[in-house]
A protein has these predicted regions:
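Adenine nucleotide-associated cytosolic modules
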Residues: 1-282
Length: 282
């Protein structure tokens, strides 16, 4: 039998593009809702869920012994981080992206294919993100289907086609082309002298989340206990459960997780989000 351990690290809130959490409670983080539904489908599969931001430390802690990495992210900074990590540790990773009605997919295999960074300069159009143009569900379905086919091939020892797939579900266009010759010998990830520049431990404490009018902020010194005590002392109404605490401050909805991670809704400006956090906690 094939033993598969699945690690989930997803966005926090329910999204109408996602089928997986349709029966889960709205108050649950998406990653927990996904874990719950998947366990109901396959009780014999072990599924670990992490309500964390993917950064260098997360990958070093949880990604060292995986067989493949399946990309479901929505920004290129995280993909470049995954790309460096995957090539440093010789782990195949499967890229997938969606913009409006277009879909893109490619599987990167260290030692066999050029990496994500080698491919990027040839494809400037895929630098658009859902933050500015949005997506439609059929394009999401097409992307994930292509990714899952390659994942099944890798897990079962079958040959993966080393090509890049691009298409538009709206117009019906679909293209594939090989990218083996795109390797850059000077690439800092897969070239002759790799330095893996995106694998640094000094990550920013904030990030704007794609298409969500939200800024993520992290301060490890603010535990859930400290937060709840602060909210009680200042008579700020809040809701809390095992996973997160939700409250409002100056017309902004704020969601806090263990480990000092906060989502500040209602702004895309990190500077404004940081000011709000300083007003709250000094």
């Amino acid at each position: 039998p094939l033993l598969i351990e699945i690690t989930l690290n997803l966005a926090i809130y329910n999204d109408k593009r996602s089928f997986i959490e349709r029966d889960a409670e709205d108050v649950l983080p998406k990653v927990i809702a996904a874990q719950k539904v998947l366990k109901e489908i396959r009780k014999d599969v072990e599924i670990d869920a992490y309500i964390e931001h993917v950064n260098y430390n997360f990958l070093e802690q949880h990604g060292m012994h995986v067989d493949i990495i399946l990309d479901a992210t929505d920004n290129f900074d995280t993909r470049q981080l995954i790309n460096d990590f995957a090539y440093k540790h010789q782990i195949p990773w499967i890229y997938g992206g969606v913009v409006q009605s277009t879909y893109v997919q490619a599987t990167f295999i260290p030692g066999e294919t050029p990496c994500f960074n080698c491919l990027m300069p040839q494809l400037p159009s895929i630098n658009l993100t859902c933050d500015t143009v949005g997506v439609i569900q059929p394009a999401v379905t097409m992307t994930t289907s292509l990714q899952l086919v390659d994942a099944l091939k890798l897990l079962t020892g079958n040959k993966v086609n080393k090509h890049f797939t691009y298409g538009d579900i709206w117009t019906g266009d679909h293209y594939t082309f090989g990218f083996s010759r795109m390797q850059n010998e000077d690439c800092k990830t897969c070239g002759n002298a790799p330095t893996y520049p995106h694998l640094n431990q000094h990550q920013q404490d904030y990030a704007t989340l794609c298409g969500r009018d939200t800024v993520q902020y992290k301060n490890a010194d603010i535990s859930q206990e400290i937060l709840l005590s602060f909210l009680e002392r200042n008579h700020i109404q809040y809701r809390t459960n095992l996973y997160m605490t939700m409250f409002r401050f100056r017309e902004h909805r704020i969601v806090a997780f263990s480990g000092g991670r906060f989502l500040i809704h209602g702004t895309t400006e990190p500077k404004k989000a940081i000011q709000l956090m300083h007003q709250l906690f000094g």
